[in-house]
A protein has these predicted regions:
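Phosphate-binding loop of NTP-binding sites
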Residues: 67, 76-197
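N-terminal leader/targeting and accessory segments in enzymes
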Residues: 1-97, 101
């Protein structure tokens, strides 16, 4: 799903950390008012208002009427396997991530994705540095710091080096041009629900 397709639907953003807030700002800038969902609920509304420049209610997952949502964009910290998320899908809601949407829109670009259990940040940083020393313009984004949604509206660069956590990769349907797997070991099993899912 592209950003334009997302903006044509009723959107909920689950998780108001860095990635969720960046997506909320992007949607608001395009005239879309998302439903915000977070396990902390209304208590984070003042911080959210300051971060996105608009007063929006923040609902607890149990407060969301899934019939009023077409697409749920989950933040990386929200497990793909949570019962509330499974219930949303059963109600017909499409579940995706900001990373998946961005990759749909930037599939034509030179994207180097770095993932793995350990070593992602180091590898992504080294790759970006090597590319910059070759005279290429580089954006180093993703799990390493700046959310990928911050890239919308910016001038293009030669190479996008993207650190991708297993949480972010779960709903990705478009493959980057190059993907580096640094290592693979049993980790984050509480989030994934077991070794097979991880």
């Amino acid at each position: 799903m592209t950003l334009d397709q997302l903006c044509a639907r009723r959107v909920a953003v689950w998780g108001v950390g860095a990635e969720g807030l960046a997506l909320a700002r992007l949607l608001l800038g395009r005239g879309v008012v998302p439903t915000l969902v977070d396990d902390r609920g209304h208590q984070v509304e003042p911080a959210v208002a300051a971060a996105v420049g608009a007063e929006l209610p923040v609902l607890l997952p149990a407060e969301v009427g899934w019939a009023s949502v077409d697409v749920l964009v989950r933040s990386p910290g929200v497990s793909r396997y949570r019962p509330e998320l499974v219930a949303a899908e059963a109600a017909g809601v499409t579940v995706t991530t900001a990373m998946a949407v961005w990759l749909e829109d930037f599939h034509h670009a030179a994207v180097l994705a770095v993932t793995g259990t350990k070593g992602k940040s180091t590898t992504a940083s080294l790759a970006a540095s090597i590319l910059e020393h070759q005279g290429r313009s580089v954006a180093l984004v993703g799990n390493i710091g700046e959310p990928v949604t911050e890239l919308y509206g910016r001038p293009p660069v030669d190479v996008y080096v993207v650190e991708v956590s297993s949480y972010q990769a779960t709903d990705v349907t478009v493959s980057p041009r190059v993907c580096v797997l640094t290592s693979l070991a049993p980790d984050h099993l509480d989030w994934h629900g077991g070794v097979d899912a991880y």
